[in-house]
C-alpha cells in the first residue's frame, strides 16, 4: 500500500509538472507593429457613397429571371461614377451577367497576385420592424443603416474607396491586385464567384492569398477575454439541406392510424435534434485557443495549454452555447415543414427540410449516412437539395498572407487581440480553393452581442467609425503587400 501511494504521488507530481511546464511555455502569439501611416479621408463623403450604395435593391435569386437585373446594372453605373480613378486605371470585366472582376497590374509579374473579395447582392428585407427603412441608406446616430451595411456592401465599397485613394496618390502595387465582386453570393455564388474563379484558372493565375468577408472584431462575446478580438476565418463549414418526405394513405382524422405522416416526420426530427454529431476541437478552433489562451487568466490558460487533458471539459462547456457549439461539431436544424390541408383530414404526405453545417473533416456523404442511421425509418425518403458545399480546407497561419492580415489589423485596430477561427457560415471564397491554399475570411468591423442578429435581420447597420477604419484597413493591407 505504501509503495502504491509513492507511485501515485510520483505520477501526480510528474503530471502536475507537465501541466505547469506546458502552461509556462504557452506564450503570446500577438505581435507589436508600428502604427499605420496617416491617411486623410473625407468621412462625410465616404458615408454618403456607402449610403447611396445601400439604396440599390440588389437582391439575388436562385432563379436568374427573378434577380434584380436592372438594379445590378444601375449599381454598376453608380460604381463607375463614384470611383473615376478605378474606372480609368483598372481593367473591369463583367462575369456571369453581373459580377465584376477588376485587375490592377503590379510592377513585378513574378509575384503572386492578391485577390480581395466582396459581394454586391443582398438578401430580401421587409419594411416592418426597422428603425430606418431597409433600403434607405439612412445616416443617423453615428451609423449607416440598411440592408448590406454589414453584409456586404460595406466591404465592397471600402475596397474601392481604398483603391481609389491609392490611385489618386499615384501608388502602383508591386504585385497584381484583383478585386472580385460577386452578384449571387447569397444563393451560392455559382454564376458569379465560381465563374470568376473559372476564368482565372483558365488564365493560369495562382494567388498568394484571398481575403473575403467573414468573421469580425468581436467585443464582449468571447468568455475570459475583455479586449476586442479580431477573428480571422481560416476555414468555413460545409452546407447541405436534406428533404425528409413520407407518403401514407391519409384519410379521415376520426380514425387515425398508429403513425400518421406528420407523426412519422415529427418523430424523425425529434431523433435528429436529440442526437448530436460528435464534437471535435478541429484545426481552426485549436488555432484560436493557441492565440487566445495565453491572453486569459491562469486557470483558463492552464486548461487551453493542456488540451490533451482538458479537451472533454472544454467541449462540454462550449456545447452549452449555440454560438460556441457550432464551432465544435456539425450542426443540424429543421428549417421547413409541410403537411396538411384541413383540421379534420389526415395528410397523405408530409415533408420537412433540415439544414446541416459541416465541420471541417466531415463530408456530406458521411453526415447523410448518419442522418439515415439516426432516423432509422424506411418509410422516409431522404433527398439532398441541390445547393451543397463540402467544408473548406483549413488555411495555415504560418503563411505570408495570414501574417500580413495580422500585421495590418494590429496597425488599424491596435486595441484588439487577433486569432484564427472557424467561420460557421458560407462565403464565395470557397470557389477559389483551386487558386490558392491561403483563403481568409475577415471583415474588421466591431460586433457586439446585440449585433449578431443584424446579419440578415432587421436594423442592419455599420458604425461610421468602423466604416472609416475599414477603408483604412484595405488601403494599409495593399500597402503592406509590398515585398
Say what each PLM segment does.
Residues 51, 55-59, 80-88, 161-168, ...:
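Sec-exported extracytoplasmic/periplasmic mature domains
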Residues 41, 92, 103, 109-110, ...:
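An extended, acidic, His-containing surface patch that forms the Zn2+-binding/catalytic region
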Residues 1-13:
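N-terminal Sec-pathway targeting helices
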Residues 12-147, 168-173, 354:
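Acidic/His- and Gly-rich active-site-bordering loop/insert found
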Residues 51-65, 245-248, 383-390:
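Acidic/histidine-rich, surface-exposed loop or edge segments in extracytoplasmic proteins
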Residues 25-33, 200-209, 216-227, 232-241, ...:
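Acidic-enriched catalytic cores of C-N bond-cleaving enzymes acting on peptides and small amides
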Residues 143-144, 148-231:
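Acidic/histidine-rich catalytic neighborhood of metal-dependent amide-processing enzymes
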Amino acid at each position: 500500500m505504501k509503495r502504491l501511494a509513492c507511485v501515485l504521488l510520483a505520477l501526480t507530481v510528474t503530471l502536475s509538472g507537465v501541466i505547469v511546464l506546458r502552461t509556462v511555455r504557452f506564450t503570446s502569439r500577438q505581435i507589436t507593429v508600428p502604427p499605420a501611416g496617416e491617411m486623410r479621408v473625407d468621412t462625410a463623403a465616404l458615408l454618403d457613397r456607402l449610403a447611396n450604395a445601400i439604396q440599390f435593391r440588389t437582391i439575388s435569386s436562385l432563379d436568374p429571371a427573378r434577380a434584380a437585373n436592372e438594379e445590378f446594372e444601375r449599381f454598376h453605373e453608380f460604381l463607375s461614377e463614384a470611383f473615376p480613378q478605378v474606372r480609368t486605371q483598372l481593367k473591369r470585366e463583367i462575369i456571369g451577367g453581373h459580377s465584376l472582376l477588376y485587375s490592377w497590374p503590379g510592377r513585378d509579374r513574378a509575384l503572386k497576385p492578391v485577390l480581395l473579395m466582396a459581394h454586391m447582392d443582398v438578401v430580401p428585407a421587409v419594411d416592418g420592424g426597422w428603425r430606418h427603412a431597409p433600403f434607405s441608406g439612412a445616416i443617423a446616430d453615428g451609423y449607416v443603416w440598411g440592408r448590406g451595411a454589414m453584409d456586404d456592401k460595406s466591404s465592397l465599397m471600402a475596397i474601392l474607396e481604398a483603391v481609389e485613394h491609392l490611385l489618386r496618390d499615384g501608388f502602383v502595387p508591386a504585385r497584381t491586385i484583383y478585386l472580385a465582386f460577386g452578384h449571387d453570393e447569397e444563393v451560392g455564388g455559382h454564376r458569379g464567384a465560381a465563374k470568376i474563379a473559372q476564368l482565372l484558372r483558365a488564365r493560369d493565375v495562382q494567388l498568394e492569398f484571398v481575403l473575403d468577408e467573414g468573421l469580425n472584431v468581436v467585443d464582449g462575446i468571447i468568455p475570459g477575454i475583455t479586449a476586442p478580438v479580431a477573428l480571422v476565418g481560416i476555414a468555413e463549414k460545409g452546407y447541405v439541406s436534406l428533404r425528409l418526405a413520407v407518403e401514407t394513405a391519409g384519410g379521415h382524422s376520426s380514425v387515425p392510424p398508429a403513425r400518421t405522416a406528420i407523426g412519422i416526420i415529427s418523430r424523425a426530427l425529434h431523433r435528429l435534434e436529440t442526437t448530436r454529431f460528435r464534437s471535435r476541437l478541429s484545426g481552426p478552433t485549436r488555432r484560436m485557443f493557441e492565440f487566445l489562451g495565453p491572453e486569459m487568466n491562469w486557470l483558463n490558460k492552464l486548461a487551453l495549454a493542456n488540451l490533451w487533458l482538458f479537451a472533454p471539459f472544454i467541449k462540454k462547456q462550449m456545447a452549452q452555447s449555440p454560438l460556441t457549439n457550432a464551432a465544435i461539431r456539425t450542426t443540424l436544424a429543421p428549417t421547413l415543414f409541410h403537411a396538411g390541408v384541413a383540421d379534420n383530414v389526415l395528410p397523405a404526405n408530409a415533408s420537412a427540410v433540415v439544414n446541416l453545417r459541416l465541420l471541417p473533416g466531415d463530408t456530406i456523404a458521411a453526415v447523410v449516412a448518419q442522418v439515415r442511421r439516426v432516423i432509422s425509418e424506411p418509410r422516409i425518403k431522404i433527398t439532398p437539395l441541390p445547393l451543397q458545399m463540402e467544408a473548406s480546407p483549413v488555411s495555415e497561419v504560418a503563411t505570408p498572407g495570414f501574417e500580413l492580415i495580422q500585421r495590418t489589423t494590429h496597425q488599424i485596430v491596435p486595441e484588439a487581440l487577433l486569432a484564427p477561427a472557424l467561420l460557421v457560415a458560407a462565403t464565395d471564397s470557397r470557389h477559389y480553393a483551386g487558386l490558392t491554399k491561403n483563403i481568409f475570411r475577415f471583415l474588421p468591423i466591431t460586433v457586439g452581442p446585440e449585433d449578431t442578429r443584424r446579419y440578415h435581420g432587421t436594423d442592419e447597420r455599420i458604425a461610421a467609425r468602423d466604416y472609416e477604419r475599414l477603408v483604412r484597413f484595405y488601403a494599409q493591407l495593399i500597402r503592406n503587400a509590398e515585398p
